[in-house]
């Protein structure tokens, strides 16, 4: 009897312990889930090409400056291409190209949504992937256009904002405006005129190619041929410039690495560029070299045989973007170099843990490391606990490889750092022994000023006309709240933006799903190479972190037959996809779903699209008539040209100023 009672007590205690552990884990998981809602996006846009006069205005600011290549762009940022000018912006594999006299605003740019305000001008968008949870919307003064499939699209907005032309070379998009909705499919060009009270549209053939189209197609061909897509994901923003400026090779101990082809004596990563303050990440590196985006926001750097090699992380669908993968030297409060008040930094080496200096969750710290380097998951957890949970301001118990590389540490004055001045032209001479013994910090205790946000761009008078700046657009989705100026954010933080509680402790990280690292075709049709295993430690191998991937993108079959030049042409199968008000024929794999409108801070330049109403019989008759006219004029066979049907109509010239 006593033995039976003893066993029953043991079972009860064990059950209680299990329930307590389970409850604690659940609470910790909920805490981490809540904390993730405050994580910054894992991607940004990059200004990677400009021709002519390109002006940029950071979110929340009033000043327009020259567009600086490699400047990261986020929600709220504005870009203007003046007369006879062009610009190209990349978000992963998606290319956004601006024509002459074109102004855009990134209303929302986060992990799942790209929402662009197009107030005037011409915009060409090449979308290579659309995941199930991705949303891509372009808002103009009279319509909202949602891209439903990978493809190539062009939107033209007249100077007075009363007319929007939507052209679909391949793909499928959905138009909402004036209380009606339409689909625009491959091989169609639809023109929408009027406002939300009365919106009319015409349907026609895709116009002949103009100079902007030809330029965009040439840029696409360059990306299609990129050999770097064999070694990194196309969703790594900036991959397309690596072929032209460097070479891939195998490096023992690191695997396949990339090395810049021509650099000057004394070159080191994160030296030839400047720092800017980009919210919500804070201090962000902007490299001068035309190839200087991917190698400074993804992966790690290794010094091998007297040269620097960039070591990308495991090939994942979308690696997490970082503002700068460095560790800071002497950036803590109260520390001065013997040469004066300054800030130093060096690139992280493969396998070293990056600890963000901005507010993030434990899951974010895991993902930003395991998608950018091959690292032991236990090591990430240990560093996280030491630096964040225990709130250590310095990192003294970790040996950093590149801190001891001759010439690997860059130090500049406080004034040069905060005012976005070129680092290479403002170097401080610091003794190597002082650099090695200086404390390592994850963040810099340097308060930004307006120049930190504006960056290295010079003030310009070239900017959009006042009517374009203030012109509202029609939107289906609620945009991100407007960004406050740096002065407003500092005032809200009590005057010291960098002294806020950056990270609050959360529960254990969720285990990331295992991912096969074997070379295999991915959704782009290029190979994925796993990283070499450099450790002989069995425990290291068992604990090696697996990248936490986004859901595998659904594969959409492109409409049409590949042409001689490799671009899909509109297919005859699309002929009967008539744009029908309120009841459009939906794509096979994805349908337009109106978003749930949630209360949000209103945006002064966005008007919600009116609810879609049932078309009248007269409207349906007009829709059928327009479709039949378009259908009769369409070629009987797929065109042999690159992207537009034969016998196409000339593109209408926009009126000059």
Q: Predicted regions span which residues?
A:
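Short, intrinsically disordered, low-complexity terminal/loop segments
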Residues: 2, 30, 655-657
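Sec/Tat signal peptide C-region and signal peptidase I cleavage site
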Residues: 22-28
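Flexible, surface-exposed loop/linker segments and immediately adjacent secondary-structure boundaries
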Residues: 28-181, 185-189, 225, 347
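Solvent-exposed, flexible loop/coil residues
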Residues: 5, 68-71, 77, 108-110, ...
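Low-complexity, repeat-rich tail regions
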Residues: 191-657
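Bacterial N-terminal signal peptides
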Residues: 11-21
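Bacterial N-terminal signal peptides that target proteins for export
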Residues: 2-13
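Extended, hydrophobic interaction surfaces within ordered domains
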Residues: 23, 165-214
């Amino acid at each position: 009897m006593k033995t039976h009672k003893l066993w029953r007590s043991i079972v009860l205690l064990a059950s209680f312990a299990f329930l307590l552990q389970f409850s604690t884990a659940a609470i910790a998981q909920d805490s981490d889930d809540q904390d993730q809602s405050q994580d910054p996006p894992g991607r940004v846009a990059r200004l990677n090409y400009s021709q002519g006069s390109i002006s940029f205005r950071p979110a929340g600011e009033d000043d327009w400056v020259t567009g600086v290549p490699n400047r990261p762009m986020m929600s709220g940022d504005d870009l203007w291409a003046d007369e006879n000018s062009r610009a190209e912006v990349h978000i992963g594999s998606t290319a956004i190209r601006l024509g002459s006299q074109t102004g855009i605003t990134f209303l929302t740019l986060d992990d799942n949504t790209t929402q662009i305000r197009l107030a005037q001008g011409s915009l060409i968008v090449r979308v290579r992937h659309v995941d199930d949870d991705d949303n891509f919307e372009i808002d103009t003064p009279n319509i909202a256009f949602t891209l439903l499939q990978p493809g190539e699209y062009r939107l033209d907005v007249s100077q007075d904002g009363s007319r929007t032309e939507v052209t679909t070379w391949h793909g499928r998009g959905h138009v909402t405006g004036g209380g009606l909705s339409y689909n625009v499919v491959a091989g169609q060009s639809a023109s929408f005129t009027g406002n939300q009270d009365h919106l009319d549209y015409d349907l026609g053939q895709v116009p002949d190619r103009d100079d902007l189209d030809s330029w965009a197609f040439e840029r696409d061909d360059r990306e299609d041929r990129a050999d770097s897509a064999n070694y990194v994901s196309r969703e790594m923003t900036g991959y397309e410039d690596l072929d032209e400026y460097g070479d891939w090779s195998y490096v023992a101990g690191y695997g396949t690495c990339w090395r810049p082809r021509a650099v000057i004596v004394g070159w080191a990563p994160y030296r030839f560029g400047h720092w800017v303050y980009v919210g919500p990440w804070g201090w962000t590196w902007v490299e001068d070299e035309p190839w200087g985006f991917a190698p400074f926001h993804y992966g790690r750097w290794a010094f091998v045989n007297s040269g620097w090699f960039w070591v990308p992380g495991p090939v994942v669908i979308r690696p997490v973007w970082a503002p700068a993968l460095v560790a800071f030297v002497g950036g803590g409060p109260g520390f001065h170099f013997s040469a004066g008040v300054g800030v130093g930094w060096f690139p992280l080496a493969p396998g070293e843990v990056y600890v963000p200096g901005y507010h993030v969750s434990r899951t974010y710290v895991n993902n930003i490391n395991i998608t950018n380097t091959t690292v032991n998951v236990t090591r990430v957890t240990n560093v996280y606990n030491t630096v964040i949970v225990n709130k250590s301001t310095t990192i003294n118990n970790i040996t950093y490889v590149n801190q001891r590389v001759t010439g690997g540490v860059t130090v500049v004055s406080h004034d040069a750092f905060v005012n976005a001045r070129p680092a290479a032209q403002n170097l401080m001479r610091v003794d190597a022994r002082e650099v090695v013994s200086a404390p390592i910090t994850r963040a810099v205790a340097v308060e930004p000023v307006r120049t930190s946000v504006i960056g290295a761009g010079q003030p310009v008078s070239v900017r959009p006309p006042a009517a374009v700046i203030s012109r509202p657009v029609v939107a289906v989705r609620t945009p991100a709240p407007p960004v406050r100026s740096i002065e407003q954010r500092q005032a809200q933080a009590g005057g010291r933006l960098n002294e806020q509680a950056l990270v609050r402790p959360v529960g254990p990280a969720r285990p990331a799903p295992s991912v096969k690292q074997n070379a295999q075709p991915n959704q782009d049709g290029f190979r994925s190479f796993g990283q070499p295993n450099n450790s002989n430690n069995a425990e290291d191998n068992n604990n090696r972190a697996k990248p936490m991937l986004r859901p595998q993108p659904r594969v959409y079959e492109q409409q049409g037959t590949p042409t001689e030049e490799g671009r899909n042409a509109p297919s005859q199968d699309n002929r009967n996809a008539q744009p029908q008000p309120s009841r459009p024929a939906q794509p096979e794999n994805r349908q337009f779903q109106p978003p749930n409108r949630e209360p949000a801070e209103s945006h002064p330049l966005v008007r919600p699209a009116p609810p879609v109403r049932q078309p009248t019989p007269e409207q349906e008759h007009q829709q059928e008539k327009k479709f039949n006219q378009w259908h009769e004029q369409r070629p009987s066979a797929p065109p042999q040209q690159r992207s537009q049907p034969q016998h196409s109509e000339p593109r209408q010239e926009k009126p000059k100023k």
